[in-house]
């Protein structure tokens, strides 16, 4: 990685979330909705940029009002949108997201097909991908062709150019034809990632075991990995590297909306790793990076909406110092 840029390139979907104006109601009961930009890979890119890092996004949007708005949001937040293409024949994806009374979320998606699913490998901005120090992606882009092939090709290009590959499956069961296909396709690219982050729910989904004990987590470990993380919400996270493992507690905050908290965590961690790649081999440095990421995720959960809640470095350090 010596001499490489600190650019984090994020690949995948960006969409509009419609969130009820009132928490704790079903979609049918919601009196009104507010629109919020979303999509995990885009959230990660903006999280990196908000923290002062170099970030770019690669994906496809509809050539419509919402698509143009989302591209402008990337630019306004300091994210390079040179990898964004527009589809005149398909709409930008929409998701209706219910915030339950406990701040957790339920989803209903409108994608049949949406523009992000139609990205082809010929539309990839190869030069941008080759500049990545870290290439980050989820699994939603694996669901359907032609986006799946574009995703696999983008991973190859990034890997060949020397990037670290970062994978957050970001499971959305409702989007997959079946649980079995979701599990198979999510795991189909598992061995290629250097850094993998899963939630407690994803750990159970992928292993079939409702436990966060080390022996269960290690079922997802691969010798090719540099870092495996399991996020435990307000309990912090567990981490597994080649030569060490451990747990880092979270910061206690008043949760309002967990949307984007995991993406904020990932963005903050990747920001720290590109600043000092040796943290992947140094337990003390890695724990400091994870503390920073935990603080970033915690702050994001204290406000409504993902992108508006993503903190600056000053805000993150302030929380860390006050804890």
Swiss-Prot record:
Its EC number is 2.7.1.4. Completely inhibited at 50 mM ATP, but not inhibited at high fructose concentration. GO terms for cellular component: cytosol. CDD domains: bac_FRK. One of its GO terms (biological process) is fructose metabolic process. Keywords: ATP-binding, Carbohydrate metabolism, Kinase, Nucleotide-binding, Transferase. InterPro entries: Carboh/pur_kinase_PfkB_CS (IPR002173), PfkB_Carbo_kinase (IPR050306), PfkB_dom (IPR011611), Ribo/fructo_kinase (IPR002139), Ribokinase-like (IPR029056). The keyword Calcium does not apply. The keyword Nucleotide-binding applies. GO terms for molecular function: ATP binding; fructokinase activity. It catalyses: D-fructose + ATP = D-fructose 6-phosphate + ADP + H(+). Expressed in root, endosperm and leaf tissues. Pathway: Glycan biosynthesis; starch biosynthesis. PROSITE patterns: PFKB_KINASES_1 (PS00583), PFKB_KINASES_2 (PS00584). Belongs to the carbohydrate kinase PfkB family. Fructokinase that may play an important role in maintaining the flux of carbon towards starch formation. May also be involved in a sugar-sensing pathway. This is Fructokinase-1. The lineage of its organism: Eukaryota, Viridiplantae, Streptophyta, Embryophyta, Tracheophyta. The gene is FRK1.
């Amino acid at each position: 990685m010596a001499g490489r840029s600190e650019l984090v390139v994020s690949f995948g979907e960006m969409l509009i979330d419609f969130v009820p104006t009132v928490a704790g109601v079903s979609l049918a009961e919601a009196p009104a909705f507010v629109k919020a930009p979303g999509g995990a890979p885009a959230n990660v890119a903006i999280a990196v940029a908000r923290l002062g890092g170099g970030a770019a996004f690669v994906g496809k949007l509809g050539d419509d009002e919402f698509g143009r708005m989302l591209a402008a949001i990337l630019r306004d937040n300091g994210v390079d949108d040179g990898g964004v293409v527009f589809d005149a024949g398909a709409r930008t994806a929409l998701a209706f997201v219910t915030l339950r009374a406990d701040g957790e979320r339920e989803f209903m998606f409108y994608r049949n097909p949406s523009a992000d699913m139609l990205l082809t490998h010929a539309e990839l901005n190869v030069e941008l991908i080759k500049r990545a120090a870290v290439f980050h992606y989820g699994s939603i882009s694996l669901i359907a062709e032609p986006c799946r092939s574009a995703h696999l090709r983008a991973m190859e290009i990034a890997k060949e150019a020397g990037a670290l590959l970062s994978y957050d499956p970001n499971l959305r069961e409702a989007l997959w034809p079946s649980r079995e296909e979701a599990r198979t396709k999510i795991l189909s690219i598992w061995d290629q990632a250097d850094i993998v982050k899963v939630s407690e729910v994803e750990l159970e989904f992928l292993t079939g075991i409702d436990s966060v004990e080390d022996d269960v987590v290690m079922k997802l470990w691969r010798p090719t990995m540099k870092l495996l993380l399991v996020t435990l919400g307000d309990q912090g996270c567990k981490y597994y590297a080649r030569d060490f493992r451990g747990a880092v507690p979270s910061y206690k905050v008043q949760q309002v909306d967990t949307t984007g908290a995991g993406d904020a965590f990932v963005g903050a961690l990747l920001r720290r790793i590109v600043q000092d790649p040796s943290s992947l081999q140094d337990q003390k440095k890695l724990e400091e990076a994870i503390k920073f990421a935990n603080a970033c995720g915690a702050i994001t959960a204290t406000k409504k909406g993902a992108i508006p809640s993503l903190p600056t470095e000053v805000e993150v350090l302030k929380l860390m110092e006050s804890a």
